[in-house]
């Protein structure tokens, strides 16, 4: 009898371990996307309150959400989905395990007793404050510089909108937007592939305009008192038809001193150092335009 119970227990443990392993493989193949990561157990904080959408914003958001959004990428703090017509991206904040609904499932005891987990928890709350502040400020002060259409942080009951998400396995999810933290943004083209295409087609005037847009974007943010703490041009900046924008809106930090020309001019040069190197190595015909634009600040 005891032997049979031990065998059943062992088989149960083996089955659970196998299922957990299979689940982990599926999770990785699905772009590390899980619907659970979108829902937080945090209480609404007045610090993150944002105005209700205007009638114009409400209509624009509703029009954008009439289509499905397909899995695009997992960033440092968000999942991104692109619209069927490739005009929009919707990003959802990806909450750490201890901030999710049913947080005890992942680490039922360690966040209470493990010093390492306590440090991780403190770090996560600090990063959350940085990210949500950046989302809020991007919506309130930097819409032109970020292409943000609408931002929602705290749980609410007034949006009454849903969006259909499609993950990498083609599974579909209906998400109530009142319940999650999200940013609806214009979809932008990446900078370096665009430069490469224009240069190979010898559309040098358009390529020069791209360079101008990038420099003016960084300058505009500085003049409004914001700097980017993750200034990777190749993945975090993009191009719309008429301007460059910040694709990543989670690391834009308030810095009043950067408003001064003696501070923002060297900052712009530093931020575009990688661009200058690319021009030197790959697009030498465009280097003079870069130098002229930077020197005219």
Regions found by a protein language model. Give the residues of each.
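Conserved ATP-binding subdomain of kinase catalytic cores across diverse folds
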Residues: 20-229, 240-241
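Conserved protein-kinase catalytic-loop position immediately C-terminal to the HRD catalytic Asp
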Residues: 234-236
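C-lobe/activation-segment region of protein kinase-like
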Residues: 202-210, 223-229, 239-297
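Hydrophobic membrane-insertion alpha-helices, especially the h-region
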Residues: 5-24
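N-terminal hydrophobic targeting signals that begin at the initiator methionine
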Residues: 1-3
């Amino acid at each position: 009898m005891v032997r049979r119970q031990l065998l059943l227990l062992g088989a149960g443990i083996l089955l659970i371990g196998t299922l957990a392993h299979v689940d982990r493989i599926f999770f990785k193949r699905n772009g590390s996307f899980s619907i659970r990561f979108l829902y937080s157990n945090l209480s609404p904080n007045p610090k993150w309150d944002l105005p209700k959408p205007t009638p114009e914003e409400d209509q624009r958001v509703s029009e954008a959400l009439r289509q499905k959004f397909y899995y695009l990428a997992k960033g440092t703090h968000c999942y991104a989905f692109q619209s069927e017509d490739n005009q929009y991206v919707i990003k959802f904040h990806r909450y750490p395990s201890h901030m999710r609904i049913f947080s005890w499932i992942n680490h039922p005891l360690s966040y209470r007793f493990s010093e390492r987990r306590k440090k991780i928890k403190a770090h996560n709350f600090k990063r959350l404050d940085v990210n949500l502040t950046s989302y809020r400020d991007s919506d309130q002060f930097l819409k032109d510089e970020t292409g943000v259409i609408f931002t929602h942080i705290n749980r609410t009951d007034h949006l009454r909108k849903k969006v259909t998400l499609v993950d990498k396995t083609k599974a579909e999810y209906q998400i109530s937007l009142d319940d999650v933290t999200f940013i609806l943004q214009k979809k932008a083209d990446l900078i370096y592939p665009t430069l490469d295409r224009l240069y190979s087609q010898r559309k040098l005037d358009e390529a020069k305009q791209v360079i101008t847009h990038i420099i003016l974007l960084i300058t505009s943010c500085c003049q409004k008192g914001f700097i980017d703490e993750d200034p990777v041009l190749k993945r975090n900046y993009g191009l719309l038809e008429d301007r460059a924008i910040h694709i990543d809106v989670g690391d834009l930090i308030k810095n009043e001193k950067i408003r001064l020309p003696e501070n923002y001019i060297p900052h712009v040069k530093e931020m575009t150092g990688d661009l200058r190197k690319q021009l030197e190595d790959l697009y030498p015909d465009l280097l003079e335009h870069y130098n002229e634009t930077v020197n005219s600040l």
